[in-house]
Every structure is written in structure tokens, then in C-alpha cells.
């Protein structure tokens, strides 16, 4: 049995915490009745060991063991820095 680690990409929406960030993951979902595709957002708390992310950065994250009550994802890399 192979266990593939889940990885996702998203945008940083908050970096106010120490060693933690909040990442918004956007996905498209089809409406069950009308068939229109709707944009849905999920916010995940992510562990950022070196505090290297800022708001607006595009990041890659992966699932890990639970680090706190709400944090079970860790930062893999910063894909694209935000233009300020």
C-alpha cells in the first residue's frame, strides 16, 4: 500500500501569527441543480517554521501530523512572492 502525501497550492491570507500562516485554497464546484461552476474557498492553518511567507504569496503546502488543534499542514516552498 502506498501512502501519497497530499500537497496543495494556495494564497497566504494571514501571517500575523508566529510560525503560522493561513492559506486560502480555491476550488471550482458544480452547482447540483443549475450546473454553474461556483468558486469555493477553504482556509487552512499552515506551519511556517522560518516565518518566510507574507500576505499574497503563492505557496505549496503538504499534509502532516497534527501540530495543534487547527494546524495539520506544513509549508513546502514559496512558489511566487507577492508584488508589493
From Swiss-Prot:
InterPro entries linked: NA-bd_OB-fold, Ribosomal_uS17, Ribosomal_uS17_bact/chlr, Ribosomal_uS17_CS
A Pfam family matched in the record: Ribosomal_S17
Recorded GO CC terms: cytosolic small ribosomal subunit
Species of origin: Klebsiella pneumoniae subsp. pneumoniae (strain ATCC 700721 / MGH 78578)
Recorded GO MF terms: rRNA binding; structural constituent of ribosome
BP terms from Gene Ontology: translation
Keywords: Ribonucleoprotein, Ribosomal protein, RNA-binding, rRNA-binding
NCBIfam families the record matches: PRK05610.1, uS17_bact
Record bears the keyword RNA-binding: yes
Annotated function: One of the primary rRNA binding proteins, it binds specifically to the 5'-end of 16S ribosomal RNA.
Gene3D superfamilies assigned to the protein according to its UniProt record, in alphabetical order: Nucleic acid-binding proteins
Similarity annotation: Belongs to the universal ribosomal protein uS17 family.
Assembly and binders: Part of the 30S ribosomal subunit.
Coiled coil ranges: none
Protein name per its UniProtKB record: Small ribosomal subunit protein uS17
Amino acid at each position: 500500500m502506498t501512502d501519497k502525501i497530499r500537497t496543495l497550492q494556495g494564497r497566504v491570507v494571514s501571517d500575523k501569527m508566529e510560525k503560522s500562516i493561513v492559506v486560502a485554497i480555491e476550488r471550482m464546484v458544480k452547482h447540483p441543480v443549475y450546473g454553474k461552476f461556483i468558486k469555493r474557498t477553504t482556509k487552512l492553518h499552515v506551519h511556517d517554521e522560518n516565518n518566510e511567507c507574507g500576505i499574497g504569496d503563492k505557496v505549496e503546502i503538504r499534509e502532516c501530523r497534527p501540530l495543534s488543534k487547527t494546524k495539520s499542514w506544513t509549508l513546502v516552498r514559496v512558489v511566487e512572492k507577492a508584488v508589493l
